Amino acid sequence: MDFSFTPTPDKRDFLKEMGRSINDEVLKNKVDPIIGRDNEIRRLIEILSRKNKNNPVLIGEPGVGKTAIVEGFVRRVVNNDVPLNLRDVEIYELSLSGLIAGTQYQGEFEKRVNGILKQVKESNGKIILFIDEIHQIVGLGRNSSSGAMDIANILKPMLARGEIKVIGATTLKEYREYVEKDGALERRFQKILVSEPSQQEALTIMRGLKTRWELFHNLTIFDSALVAAVEMSARYIPDRNLPDKAIDLIDEASAKIKTEMASEPVVIDTLKREIINLETEYAALKQDKENADNKKKQGHLDNLKQQLDELKKKRDSLTAEWKKEKTNFESINKLKKEIEDLQTRLELYQTEGNYEAASKILYYDIPKLKNQLEQAQKKYVDSKHDLFKTEVSENEVAEVVSQATGIPLKKLLETEKEKLLHLGDEIKKRVKGQDAAVETVVNTVMRGRVNLNDPNRPIGSFIFLGSTGVGKTELAKSLAEVLFDNEKAMIRFDMSEYMEKHSVAKLIGAPPGYVGYEQSGLLTEAVRRKPYCVLLFDEIEKAHPDVTNILLQVLDDGTLKDSQGRLVNFKNTMIIMTSNLGSNYIMENKRDLAMEALKKHFRAEFINRIDEIVFFSVLQKTTVLEIITNLLDQLNQRLAKQNLKFTFDPKLNEFIYKSSFDEQFGARPIKRFIDRQIATLIAKQILEGIITKDVSYNVIVEKDKVAIVANKVKS
């Protein structure tokens, strides 16, 4: 009896198990077409046609289209638009995660890798491997306990002999960190640098993808939306690359409209809610009528019934129109999809040489469907009632950018136009006596909002010069509140905290090797999170010169790199710096001398980059009296929240002015006086039970002192 054992040969198809055929996906029209990138695809073909070192690796920043270049090459292979030596080749994308999954036993991983490489080698160049994120092959499969080799070392000998062809793709950073460290692996690949496309090239790529998006989302995308996506993404999303970021904007804007199309129109939804409210009221009144019959109530019920009938009739009519419009629109998209499928089959038949089937599609099927499409579009236009949006315009793209960045980019509504036109008046309600300064800042905001400012610089940069307490910081606060309805939209840096040279690290982050390197800088991180804001550098003259030097790049180019090398965009910020330099000259109305003091303290290149140097005037008596009235009104509002009724005697303003105002210290002593002399007195009397809620009080001046007089009123 023969007990010898003959092992069954392993017939597993490792390549199909752990990879995907890109050729099949192109044939099934699952891969988006690529327009452009001809130079990169030509270089890829040239490297693959070499005798040795015929393994290209695409290197570029994330989102520039490395994988799309490979898919574009495969499409050319499928269409026989490549040299003879590359015709009929099949490109498989290798799944590295699938390769390593379940390899718990020693030798299982090597078996899979060798099985794949054997299949590729035996194909005699007819199979090419594509490895996305190729840097991951370094160290993949290595086990320190078993001493197994990683996939990179298994590949090296076969790559060197030209037995297999591999296309790789990775980013510049990861190529440098992983592949370049292994010199033997690096020299087996030929680099193809994939740079970010220009705006015009990105627009061309997107125009090629437009039809695919329209068919997927069942809507129409205007060309103006594509242009807006490219321009806005380039300007407002600087930390990502074209065309990926522009594609994302169009995709999200389309998804937004698609969601709205799937939902009931707002007008029908509003009618339904109105009907529910009236039906509830009708049912309640009808129940009352049964208990106590009443002619007046009966008349009201009849009126409600009539309203309900009219609303239901309107709802049913609009619902029927909406469904009809939706059905017509869906039939258009169905025809478009059929035409696209026929175009794909036409290309396939032409490639295979089946000209009879190709001519039937070209001269009979496609013209027939195009004629049906034309009729369906005419029918849709005739029955259209604009109950739902079916188009993506630049406004939808702007809305997506606004949601992502917080920058208002939608077309100006009438209400916002009014707000901008009256911006100065709103700020002047808070900042008194500095009309020239307010106008300068407001004009800059208006230019920025209608995109007339230099797009490569911040919205505006100012130095506010003036003595303490004249409203420099208050103007910055009020600007943030009026523009963003929130004072917190202003990011404030007190420059007295940045008097040391090393404090630069606080703003942009600590350099490598120092404690806190992993943490982001206060300035750069704040602007990354809130790119549309007012930046206030309070008392800039107190900062160390090296701190002001880092602002040079911000003021000139609107960008700044943090310690991690990330580029932060300052182009949508308004930069305000306050200073007390030369305040004694400003008080004497000698502005030339104040400018000299500024020039002595700051370098010429710093001052030259500032848009406006704004002088704040000394507060006049009429202005101070207005400020006193404002402060007393604010105090009264706080008292009113506690249901306490107070009035202030007109003579009180003059008394506060004489008792507290000092030209040298500005308006701040006035606030301190009101807090100490009036607010404190009221607080004491509340605690003592003298002030109660059922009494109205008048704050007066009596014998050069503040006094509170009570008058009885009806509660």
Curated annotation (Swiss-Prot):
The UniProt annotation places ATP 1 binding at: 60-67
Q: Name one GO cellular component term.
A: cytoplasm
Q: Where is this region: NBD2?
A: 416-618
Coiled-coil residue windows: 247-385
Keywords carried by this UniProt record? ATP-binding, Chaperone, Coiled coil, Cytoplasm, Nucleotide-binding, Repeat, Stress response
**Which residue stretches belong to region NBD1?**
14-196
User: Which residue intervals make up region (Linker)?
Assistant: 197-406
- Annotated localization: Cytoplasm
Q: Name one GO biological process term.
A: cellular response to heat
Q: Residue ranges of region C-terminal?
A: 619-715
Q: Which SMART domains match?
A: AAA, ClpB_D2-small
Chain sites annotated for binding ATP 2: 466-473
* Keyword field contains Chaperone: yes
**Molecular-function GO terms, alphabetical:** ATP binding; ATP hydrolysis activity
InterPro entries referenced in this protein's UniProt entry, alphabetically: AAA+_ATPase, ATPase_AAA_core, Clp_ATPase_C, ClpA/B, ClpA/B_CS1, ClpA/B_CS2, ClpA/ClpB_AAA_lid, ClpA_ClpB
Concerning Pfam families, the annotation shows:
AAA, AAA_2, AAA_lid_9, ClpB_D2-small
Q: Does the keyword ATP-binding apply?
A: yes
Function text:
Part of a stress-induced multi-chaperone system, it is involved in the recovery of the cell from heat-induced damage, in cooperation with DnaK, DnaJ and GrpE. Acts before DnaK, in the processing of protein aggregates. Protein binding stimulates the ATPase activity; ATP hydrolysis unfolds the denatured protein aggregates, which probably helps expose new hydrophobic binding sites on the surface of ClpB-bound aggregates, contributing to the solubilization and refolding of denatured protein aggregates by DnaK.
What's the family? Answer: Belongs to the ClpA/ClpB family.
About its domains, the entry says: The N-terminal domain probably functions as a substrate-discriminating domain, recruiting aggregated proteins to the ClpB hexamer and/or stabilizing bound proteins. The NBD2 domain is responsible for oligomerization, whereas the NBD1 domain stabilizes the hexamer probably in an ATP-dependent manner. The movement of the coiled-coil domain is essential for ClpB ability to rescue proteins from an aggregated state, probably by pulling apart large aggregated proteins, which are bound between the coiled-coils motifs of adjacent ClpB subunits in the functional hexamer.
Q: How does it assemble?
A: Homohexamer. The oligomerization is ATP-dependent.
Protein name, entry field: Chaperone protein ClpB
Gene, per the UniProt record: clpB
